[in-house]
């Protein structure tokens, strides 16, 4: 009895992998945000440049933040990773800060036909049996074989907390294999890597939380995203449009500040602050 090729697979939970979909037309293209409030830029310096009468500019990349987008999936993964890391760090047990562990839970062949929710519920029970008290779960629908070809092999990656025991007893009772495989150099790196080839469903969250870290038991006040502001006058940055002569020659680099004649730019009608 073999495993069906991916194209022929009819398993309910055989979801496509991160980055395997199609991008939108603007994904990965760049746009400009900046500050034209040059009246407040008088007699100011930025990195050794006299900004008097100059517009402050930044280039940003357009992203759809979709997990299946082959261009923008890293932006989605980074956002998910940052939020998950905040939640993991917020957990303390009786005043003690614990070190996260990294587990896998592999689904037995007999349950391959279950829905994702059905497999998750059984995986949760196995984690409870081996004394994993809570954490985050990422679903992987496939593994690679020796020929570097993806095949259906549902399993879960867990980053959480606990003292893992009774693994053999759990396997004998449930058929689900729990392994403690250790974190990478950082928890953040582990989360990002696992998200990079997760099984993506449009109906289900890629990351779910359980046990002591579930939404019902752990309430976290997440950091609010900082507003994009001009480092010179502290005004909000606006989406800008080039109106100068010829083509805009600003290079497509993020994280770099530029300056220019403000006459070459205008605020985009119905402007949107870059988010």
What are these regions (language model features)?
Residues 1-152, 161-275:
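Right-hand nucleic-acid polymerase module
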């Amino acid at each position: 009895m073999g495993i069906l090729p991916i194209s022929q697979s009819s398993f309910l939970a055989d979801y496509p992998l991160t980055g395997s979909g199609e991008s939108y037309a603007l994904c990965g293209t760049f746009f400009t945000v900046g500050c034209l409030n040059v009246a407040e830029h008088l007699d100011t310096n930025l990195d050794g440049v006299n900004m008097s009468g100059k517009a402050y500019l930044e280039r940003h990349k357009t992203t759809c933040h979709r997990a299946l987008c082959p261009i923008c999936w890293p932006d989605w993964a980074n956002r998910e990773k940052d939020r998950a890391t905040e939640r993991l760090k917020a957990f303390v047990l009786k005043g003690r800060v614990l070190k996260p562990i990294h587990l896998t839970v592999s689904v037995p062949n007999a349950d391959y036909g279950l829905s994702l929710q059905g497999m998750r519920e059984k995986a949760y029970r196995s984690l409870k049996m081996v004394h994993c008290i809570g954490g985050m779960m990422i679903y992987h629908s496939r593994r690679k074989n020796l020929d570097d070809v993806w095949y259906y092999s549902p399993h879960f990656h867990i980053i959480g907390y606990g003292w893992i025991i009774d693994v053999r007893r759990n396997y004998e009772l449930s058929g689900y294999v729990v392994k403690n495989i250790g974190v990478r150099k950082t928890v953040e790196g582990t989360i990002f890597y696992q998200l990079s080839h997760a099984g993506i469903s449009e109906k289900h969250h890629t990351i779910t939380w359980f046990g002591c870290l579930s939404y019902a038991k752990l309430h976290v006040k997440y950091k609010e995203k900082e507003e994009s502001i001009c480092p010179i006058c502290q005004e909000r940055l606006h989406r800008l449009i080039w109106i100068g002569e010829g083509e805009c020659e600003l290079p497509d680099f993020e994280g770099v500040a530029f300056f220019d004649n403000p006459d070459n730019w205008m605020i985009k009608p119905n402007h949107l602050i870059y988010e």
